[in-house]
């Protein structure tokens, strides 16, 4: 009472297979898998771009500090 049993889940899966067919479900599964791969790849690229941005930002702050010191000495 209250929960979904394994038999109810199996009946739901069987109905879905009958409605959509195995070919359509296979296509949907492939598309979903490719979407997840693309998302993970984009996240990995985004992390590397963030790391590069931090390096560039550190270089800019160092060069700005050096320019300030040069102006103070002049």
Curated annotation (Swiss-Prot):
InterPro entries: TatA/B/E (IPR003369), TatA/E (IPR006312). Belongs to the TatA/E family. It is a single-pass membrane protein. Pfam families: TatA_B_E. GO terms for biological process: protein transport by the Tat complex. The keyword Coiled coil does not apply. Gene3D superfamilies: 1.20.5.3310. The Tat system comprises two distinct complexes: a TatABC complex, containing multiple copies of TatA, TatB and TatC subunits, and a separate TatA complex, containing only TatA subunits. Substrates initially bind to the TatABC complex, which probably triggers association of the separate TatA complex to form the active translocon. Residues 51-74 are annotated as: Disordered. It comes from the Bacteria. Part of the twin-arginine translocation (Tat) system that transports large folded proteins containing a characteristic twin-arginine motif in their signal peptide across membranes. TatA could form the protein-conducting channel of the Tat system. Keywords: Cell inner membrane, Cell membrane, Membrane, Protein transport, Translocation, Transmembrane, Transmembrane helix, Transport. The chain crosses the membrane at residues 1-21. GO terms for molecular function: protein transmembrane transporter activity. It is found in: Cell inner membrane. One of its GO terms (cellular component) is TAT protein transport complex. Its main location: membrane. This is Sec-independent protein translocase protein TatA. The keyword Membrane applies.
């Amino acid at each position: 009472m209250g929960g979904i049993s394994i038999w109810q889940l199996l009946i739901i899966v069987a109905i879905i297979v009958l409605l959509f067919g195995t070919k359509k479900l296979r296509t949907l599964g492939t598309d979903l898998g490719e979407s997840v791969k693309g998302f993970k790849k984009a996240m990995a690229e985004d992390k590397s771009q963030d790391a590069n941005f931090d390096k560039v930002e550190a270089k800019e702050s160092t060069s700005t500090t050096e320019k300030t010191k040069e102006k103070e000495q002049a």
